[in-house]
């Protein structure tokens, strides 16, 4: 399935049905009086977060969503039928924005969460409502209220506990494939990963979700490479895993490039808890490894873990470091496991 994280939709709620002008016509009743019914209410347009979805690709093929209008009122005080609602099923983590793409209407972060996008119009009153002591036979009724029309944007930000960041070919996809059942495309050329990938990772009996996004390069915030459009998918992460290619000539420069791009995208993202790991250590001799680790620690001002996604050396230590930062922010129910009953 193709990945799409931004879609434009046009929604319109149903208009209310018109009220009816009608009079009671019955044998032996000379002045039956008004009996026109009210119009039915128009249908609403809703958005609902649905589990199991992870792309907005469905909205590439259908952009227009119109709810049904209410039925018109009828004689004998019969109210028109209400119009059917229409529901847009979107992935969990979808933001709904106004046409300007800046004003956030809603952020659907929980399965089953719903938000009203366009309210249906009320039905018009039939002539029965206008009967009074001075007007015993009103000959007018209200039209129904028109529906609401809106142009909206849907923007998906995947929800993951940990987000992978790094330059192209830093080994992010290899790492994700090594620790989860995710099978991202892996090759020895830049930008092999063209869209985010999710994987469920387990360590010491705990599980969490990890997101791998396309690599960043210098100037990504200005549109170079694939730009920084995918950073939104790690914006919700509780911790970032910054992978640095140990075979690079200047690991400190590589780390600085990523930190600069994170800061340019969002200062809040740059301040997130972060684990830094020097990858591909299986390709380095001990002396070079020690030099590059020291240079990287001096650049970031903190400890650097060593690992190899290919040989899996040091992978467990990295996962434990991630979990130690994820666990405090987890709700107790999120990590509760079913245990056998004990008397």
Swiss-Prot record:
Record's function text: An essential GTPase which binds GTP, GDP and possibly (p)ppGpp with moderate affinity, with high nucleotide exchange rates and a fairly low GTP hydrolysis rate. Plays a role in control of the cell cycle, stress response, ribosome biogenesis and in those bacteria that undergo differentiation, in morphogenesis control.
GO CC terms of this entry: cytoplasm
Domain Obg: 1-159
GO molecular function, one term: GTPase activity
Superkingdom, taxonomy of origin: Bacteria
Species the sequence originates in: Paracoccus denitrificans (strain Pd 1222)
UniProt-annotated binding residues for Mg(2+): 173, 193
Pfam families in the cross-refs: GTP1_OBG, MMR_HSR1
Compartments it resides in: Cytoplasm
Residues annotated to bind GTP: 166-173, 191-195, 212-215, 279-282, 308-310
Disulfide bonds: none
EC number of the protein: 3.6.5.-
Occurrences of domain OBG-type G (ranges): 160-327
Protein name per the record: GTPase Obg
Needed co-factor(s): Mg(2+)
Keyword flag Acetylation: no
Complex formation: Monomer.
Signal peptide span: none
Keyword flag Isomerase: no
Keywords: Cytoplasm, GTP-binding, Hydrolase, Magnesium, Metal-binding, Nucleotide-binding
Homology family: Belongs to the TRAFAC class OBG-HflX-like GTPase superfamily. OBG GTPase family.
């Amino acid at each position: 399935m193709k990945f799409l994280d931004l879609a434009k939709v046009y929604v319109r709620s149903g208009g209310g049905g018109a009220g009816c002008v009608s009079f009671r016509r019955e044998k032996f009743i000379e002045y039956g009086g008004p009996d026109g019914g009210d119009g039915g209410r128009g249908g609403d347009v809703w958005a609902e977060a649905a589990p199991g979805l992870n792309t907005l690709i469905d909205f590439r093929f259908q952009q227009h969503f119109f709810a049904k209008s209410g039925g018109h009122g009828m004689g004998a005080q019969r109210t028109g039928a209400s119009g059917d609602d229409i529901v847009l099923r979107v992935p969990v983590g979808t933001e709904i924005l106004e046409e300007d793409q800046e004003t956030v209407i809603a952020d659907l972060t929980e399965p089953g969460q719903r938000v009203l996008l366009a309210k249906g119009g009320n039905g018009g009153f039939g002539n029965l409502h206008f009967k009074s002591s001075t007007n015993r036979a009103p000959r007018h009724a209200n039209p129904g209220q028109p529906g609401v029309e809106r142009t909206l944007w849907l923007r998906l930000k995947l929800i993951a506990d940990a987000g992978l960041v790094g330059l192209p070919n830093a080994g992010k996809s290899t790492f994700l494939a090594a620790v989860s059942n995710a099978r991202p495309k892996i090759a020895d050329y830049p930008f092999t990963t063209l869209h985010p990938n999710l994987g469920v990772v387990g360590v010491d009996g705990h599980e969490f979700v990890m997101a791998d996004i396309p690599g960043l390069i210098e100037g990504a915030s200005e549109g170079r490479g694939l730009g920084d459009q995918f950073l939104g998918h790690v914006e919700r992460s509780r911790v970032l895993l910054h992978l640095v290619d140990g075979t690079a000539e200047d690991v400190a420069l590589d780390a600085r490039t990523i930190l600069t791009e994170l800061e340019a995208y969002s200062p809040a993202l740059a301040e997130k808890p972060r684990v830094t790991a020097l990858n591909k250590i299986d390709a380095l001799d001990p002396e070079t490894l020690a030099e590059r680790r020291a240079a990287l620690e001096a650049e970031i001002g903190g400890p650097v873990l060593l690992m190899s996604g290919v040989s899996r050396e040091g992978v467990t230590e990295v996962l434990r470091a991630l979990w130690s930062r994820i666990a405090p922010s987890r709700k107790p129910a999120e990590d509760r496991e079913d245990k056998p009953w004990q008397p």
